[in-house]
Structure formats: C-alpha cells, structure tokens
Amino acid sequence: GRQSIDKDDVKAVVDTLNSDLLTQGPKIAEFESLLADYCGAKYAVVLSNGTAALHLANIAIGVQRKTKVLTSPISFVATSNSVIYSGGSPVFCDIDEKTFNISPSEIKKIVAMNPDVSGIIPVHLGGLIADMESISRIANENGMWVIEDACHALGGQWTDSEGVERKVGD
C-alpha cells in the first residue's frame, strides 16, 4: 500500500520545522500520547526509527554477549541487527508457509535443541500478526522473554483461543 499523507500532515511538519523546539517540543509529547492511545498502551516513547526501538528493547531486557535470540529470517535487517548491536546472537527460525511469520512448531524444535536461547523476537510481517498465543506459551514454558517487532502492526489486534481480544504487545 501507499502511505497516507495529506495537507494537514505536511503543514504540521512544516510548522514543527519552523518552531524553536524541533526534537523535544510539544509535538513529541502529543504524538506519544496519541500513539499510546492508538495502540492501547499506557505509555509510548518515540525514537528515531524502529532499529533504535528494537535496540533499546534488547538492552532493556538484558541482551548481551552470548545471549541467543530467536527471530524470523524474513524481516528488515534491523530485527537481527538489534540483537547483534546489543552483543547477542540472532538464531533464525523458519517461518510458517501460510503466514510467513515465525513458526511456533519450529520455535519448539530449536528450543529443544538449544535450551540456552533466552528470548524470541517475532515479526508481524506486513501487518499479519504472528501466532502470539503459541509463541507466548512456548516462551513462558521455557523461561524466555518476548519482544514483538510490531513495526508493521502498530495498533494491531488478535483474538485468543478463549475469544479474548488482545492487542499487539500484550
């Protein structure tokens, strides 16, 4: 698809560029509040790009040297690079042939052979949400953490097996 940028968007950017507060002005706080509301989150913190966001998330969760992290090979390079930037090693997990997202059955196989894998970074490719119920269950059963790469799925939602509507990032 195409991006949706209208005249009001262009005016808002020009107004900000012409203001005295370019990088930490009131528009940042306004955008963070709107983004949090849109995603159903309590807070949102904007960064320069998705790579920086993933890198920060990896650092915050403790990725460091020798940390192994499962992720999809079908993604923008930032997903795996964020692990590398933090000192860890990405371990690529095959995808589901129907959704093109990381495959829970393949995650199970890799974790069984590599019990030292610390976490999973599923990518919601093209807005199609990965099987987060299965991925979360596998992570919980194995003492692993999950960071969702939701760059393609901001505000996305899915319904779990009990009929409960979930938001990306729950």
Please report, for each region that a protein language model flagged, where it lies by residue.
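Generic structural signal for small/hydrophobic residues in well-ordered secondary structure
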Residues: V13, L35, A53, V69, ...
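Phosphate-binding glycine-rich loop
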Residues: L21-K68, S82-Y85, F92-D94
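Conserved coil-to-alpha-helix start sites within the AMP-binding
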Residues: I74-S80
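Active-site phosphate-binding strand-loop segment of PLP-dependent enzymes
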Residues: K98-V168
